[in-house]
């Protein structure tokens, strides 16, 4: 127990994780972390917290009941269409879709928490215009949970960072729109959303808008972000111009009218002077090769240009990769903020989705009690109603209580 407790404690505070009262839970968490260490061979920075599961919070549904109720897939075809999830899922993000599925598979049984969710959905239906604006801002958001996992495992490519930037650029307007709501759950979501404007600015300043997938091909870093990148990039694209300017300058300076800058793979770049102009060659020209009718020279300035031009591409690719990794690492350092925000966005997406479904289908808000009575008047099966055409669905009347058990 102490060994596993030490392992969990090294990753996250046991007290903060809620495991301080769960000896068996600490052992299980420690065993899982050890397994991940041994199999992933990598940092577990994406695991920022452990949340204990309480059987008193959620309804326990066995696998047979889950299948027969067709909560997330149909019994025969094993497809989403025709299931309860199919009716309820109007989410805009992958995170929201996963969270809604978890809601359906693990229904709450705590009356207070159920009513908090009802309050959030009710508020969203009372502010239809704001709700639709929220949907528009949710739609472009990529899967932040998966993106930050790739970032922390150092497998994210430049396009992942652009997707991350485009996603978090939606956060400020979403956070602002949530000012219109007063309910506890929506306020908690607003507080948990971190706009992360400095990370958005970092990626916007550094990474090309349409970068390659590979991090080893160059073309990753924007102009103006790093002076050396700009210098190497200019050397790569403007090398011929620089050489032509140097050639013209040396002709004028020396008076050698037929002086030319040439290149071969053996000697690199050189200044070629015919024998008829040998007497005009200045002292700072260093002889590199002698031919039958000409001499080849190098100057410090030409050597500097040669090093810059020939090494520019390799240096550029290497430097861009290093800068990209630096940006990626800065994002990875904010994993806790990003995960908290991703969870908040996922929950918001779910509540907006449920509000849309309730509005479109004219669902009413049930009154929750602890009396043990289920009393439904004008009940409609959400799935059957959708599958039957021409308004043929017949409303149901159901009363279930302890003495009578069931009456329809």
Roles of regions detected by a PLM:
Residues 1-9, 14, 398-408:
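Single conserved hydrophobic/aromatic residue that forms the stacking wall/gate
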Residues 10-123, 139-152, 156-245, 373:
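Charged catalytic and DNA/RNA-contacting regions of genome-maintenance
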Residues 153, 157, 167-170, 223-224, ...:
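Charged, surface-exposed helical/loop "interaction arms" that form contiguous linear patches used
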Residues 208, 291, 295-329:
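Extended, charged coiled-coil "arm/hinge" scaffolds of SMC/Rad50-like chromosome-maintenance ATPases
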Residues 272, 280, 284, 342-401, ...:
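Conserved NTPase motor "head" modules and their coupling/switch loops across ABC/AAA+ ATPases, GTPases
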Residues 199-200, 206, 213, 269-285, ...:
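Cytosolic, long alpha-helical scaffolding segments
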Residues 279-306, 390-395:
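Extended active-site and interfacial segments that coordinate phosphate-rich ligands
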């Amino acid at each position: 127990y102490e060994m596993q407790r030490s392992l969990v404690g090294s990753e996250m505070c046991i007290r903060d994780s809620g495991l301080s009262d769960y000896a068996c839970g600490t052992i299980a968490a420690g065993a899982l972390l050890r397994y991940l260490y041994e199999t992933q061979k990598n940092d577990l920075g994406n695991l920022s917290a452990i949340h204990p599961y309480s059987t008193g919070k959620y309804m326990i549904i066995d696998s047979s009941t889950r299948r027969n109720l067709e909560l997330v897939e149909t019994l025969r075809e094993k497809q989403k269409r025709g299931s309860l999830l199919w009716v309820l899922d109007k989410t805009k993000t992958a995170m929201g879709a996963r969270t809604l599925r978890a809601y359906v598979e693990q229904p709450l049984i705590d009356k207070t928490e159920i009513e908090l969710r009802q309050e959030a959905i009710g508020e969203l239906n009372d502010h239809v215009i704001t709700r639709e604006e929220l949907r528009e801002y949710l739609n472009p958001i990529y899967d932040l949970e998966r993106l930050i996992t790739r970032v922390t495992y150092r497998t994210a490519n430049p396009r992942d960072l652009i997707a991350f930037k485009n996603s978090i650029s939606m956060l400020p307007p979403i956070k602002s729109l949530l000012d219109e709501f007063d309910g506890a759950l929506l306020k908690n979501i607003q507080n948990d959303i971190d706009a992360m404007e400095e990370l958005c600015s970092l990626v916007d300043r550094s990474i090309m808008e349409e970068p390659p997938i590979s991090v080893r091909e160059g073309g990753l870093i924007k102009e103006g972000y790093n002076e050396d990148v700009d210098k190497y990039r200019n050397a790569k694209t403007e090398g011929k111009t620089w050489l032509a300017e140097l050639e013209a300058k040396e002709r004028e300076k020396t008076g050698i009218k037929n002086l030319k800058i040439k290149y071969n793979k053996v000697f690199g770049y050189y200044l070629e002077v015919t024998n008829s102009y040998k007497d005009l060659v200045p002292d700072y020209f260093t002889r590199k090769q002698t031919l039958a009718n000409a001499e080849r020279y190098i100057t410090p300035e030409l050597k500097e240009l040669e090093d810059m031009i020939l090494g520019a591409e390799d240096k550029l690719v290497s430097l861009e990769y290093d800068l990209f990794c630096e940006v990626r690492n800065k994002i990875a350092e904010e994993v806790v903020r990003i995960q908290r925000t991703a969870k908040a966005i996922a929950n918001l997406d779910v509540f907006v989705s449920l509000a849309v479904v309730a509005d479109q289908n004219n669902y009413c808000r049930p009154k929750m009690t602890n009396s043990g009575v289920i009393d439904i008047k004008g009940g409609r099966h959400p799935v059957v109603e959708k599958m039957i055409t021409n308004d043929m669905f017949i409303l149901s009347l159901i009363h279930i209580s302890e003495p009578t058990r069931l009456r329809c």
